[in-house]
Amino acid sequence: MEMFQGLLLWLLLGVAGVWASRGPLRPLCQPINATLAAEKEACPVCITFTTSICAGYCPSMKRVLPVILPPMPQRVCTYHELRFASVRLPGCPPGVDPMVSFPVALSCHCGPCRLSSTDCGGPRTQPLACDHPPLPDILFL
């Protein structure tokens, strides 16, 4: 009877593994279009623009016995290849640089979170917003 239960468990886990490997229920890490906002304190407007960012699921694991072993590094969806684009904020006073640069994702991968280039926080409940009045969307892809 124990052998039968072990065989049944092995078959169930095997089938579950095949089913799970067919594809994740969430989209994998990839470039997606997103609308972002740009403003500067001295400039009277906010510009929203559409660009590509990295977003999606990265497989992760958590140790069952974290007290005994050190924590496993968690990978995040981050830039693999990128280029930079810029927008000009209209109406900035003299002496204030009106240009705002931002990354455009060309490709993404799951890797360690580097605070120098990645927002490592979780999903946001509200989009980033501006304090100044917005101008119409600009498209950068």
From Swiss-Prot:
- Where the protein is mainly located, per its record? secreted
Q: Does the keyword Disulfide bond apply?
A: yes
Glycosylation sites (chain numbering)? N33
Q: What Gene3D superfamilies does the annotation carry?
A: Cystine-knot cytokines (2.10.90.10)
Domain of life (superkingdom): Eukaryota
**GO biological processes:** G protein-coupled receptor signaling pathway
Q: Which cysteines are joined by disulfide bonds?
A: C29-C77, C43-C92, C46-C130, C54-C108, C58-C110, C113-C120
- Does this entry carry the keyword Protein biosynthesis? no
One Gene Ontology molecular-function label: hormone activity
Localization in the cell: Secreted
Where does the record locate the signal sequence feature?
1-20
Which SMART domains does the record cross-reference, listed alphabetically?
A: GHB
- Keyword terms of this UniProt record: Disulfide bond, Glycoprotein, Hormone, Secreted, Signal
Question: What's in the GO CC field?
Answer: cytoplasm; extracellular space
Q: What does this protein do?
A: Promotes spermatogenesis and ovulation by stimulating the testes and ovaries to synthesize steroids.
Family, similarity comment: Belongs to the glycoprotein hormones subunit beta family.
Q: What is its quaternary makeup?
A: Heterodimer of a common alpha chain and a unique beta chain which confers biological specificity to thyrotropin, lutropin, follitropin and gonadotropin.
Q: By what name is this protein known?
A: Lutropin subunit beta
